[in-house]
């Protein structure tokens, strides 16, 4: 299992719902946690390792969990701006405006229906990873000028021409 980077089609593809929570999925989720922690991340979505299924994992502020088929059911009108990065776009950071709080329903690794009301950094990580499931990158959430600048910086870091 390897990280996928900006330019890979899986990062801009809408993910499919998980049909069954089984041992194979649990093993995949364990691998996701290993990749995320190995890269020093706090969240990782399945498309970032090449599988376009609706799963992400988080490890932030003592909240360590997998979200299977998550649905954001509510988001606060109050927003906050915070610098975000992404394991799939290394060394690029930009401020992103997002709702401060979200409510999420999801299945856990045992297929149990769960819900969480998140705020602060946990809410931000959930929203960032949830976006991946819809083929949205954090750079899609910023203005065009900043996005173009970030893409130029990324291309220079990757040694490519865009």
Curated annotation (Swiss-Prot):
Fe cation binds at residues 86, 128, 132. One of its GO terms (molecular function) is peptide deformylase activity. The active site is at residue 129. The keyword Protein biosynthesis applies. It comes from the Bacteria. Its cofactor is Fe(2+). Pfam families: Pep_deformylase. It is an enzyme of class 3 (hydrolase). CDD domains: Pep_deformylase. Keywords: Hydrolase, Iron, Metal-binding, Protein biosynthesis. InterPro entries: Peptide_deformylase, Peptide_deformylase_sf. One of its GO terms (biological process) is co-translational protein modification. HAMAP family: Pep_deformylase (MF_00163). Removes the formyl group from the N-terminal Met of newly synthesized proteins. Requires at least a dipeptide for an efficient rate of reaction. N-terminal L-methionine is a prerequisite for activity but the enzyme has broad specificity at other positions. Belongs to the polypeptide deformylase family. This is Peptide deformylase. It comes from Treponema pallidum (strain Nichols).
